Amino acid sequence: MSQTPIELKGSSFTLSVVHLHDSQPEVIYQALQEKIEQAPAFLKNAPVVINVAALTAETDWIKLQQAISSTGLHVVGVSGCTDDALKKTIAQAGLPLLSEGKAQRRVVEPVAAVPAAVKTKVINTPVRSGQQIYARNCDLIVTSSVSAGAEVIADGNIHIYGMMRGRALAGVSGDVQSQIFCTHLAAELVSIAGRYWLSDQIPEPYFGQPARINLNQLDNVLTIKPLD
């Protein structure tokens, strides 16, 4: 029996979302170029989603898209668009409009629940440049080093017991309580639930040192402290 020519499967990918706060193409181009120069291994020729929630219908989307594409970034979709006229322009440009969905309202349950067992994925070998490790629905522990150009991703926490030179993305499914633990933090990028620092944004006293990174849920920004 011959195999069908196509097969549809669900999957998930880690994409950077560029939030536009200015509609001037030259301003956006310059800002993106600076970001790419800061982290070329992470952003050069990268697929990105553009969030246009802060833009209005008067935005010249064609020129804006050209400015973004001229940096080498590949726009795979647009999110945050609520203006019908802008939606039409974006659709005519051949780009899909993505829905991020509504955040679920948290309900405090008075009845104590039995805590579920926490799963952990353990990697005992070095993670080389170009490799990507994803711990789906669990924490990730790497007992060796993570090279520049490598990527470690987890829906939960990430623990690196070696030199961390690559990219670490924790809580990629939206878990804002996830944390990143490194014995030697020299990462190209660290991210928790979509909030990230590039290497030059990591506070200098912690670079190359044992550190613990989490997300301050009051103001939704990353914070860092020594790893005891």
From Swiss-Prot:
It holds the Pfam family MinC_C. One of its GO terms (biological process) is regulation of cell septum assembly. Keywords: Cell cycle, Cell division, Septation. Belongs to the MinC family. InterPro entries: CAP/MinC_C, MinC, MinC_C_sf, MinC_N, Septum_form_inhib_MinC_C. PANTHER family: SEPTUM SITE-DETERMINING PROTEIN MINC. Cell division inhibitor that blocks the formation of polar Z ring septums. Rapidly oscillates between the poles of the cell to destabilize FtsZ filaments that have formed before they mature into polar Z rings. Prevents FtsZ polymerization. This is Probable septum site-determining protein MinC.
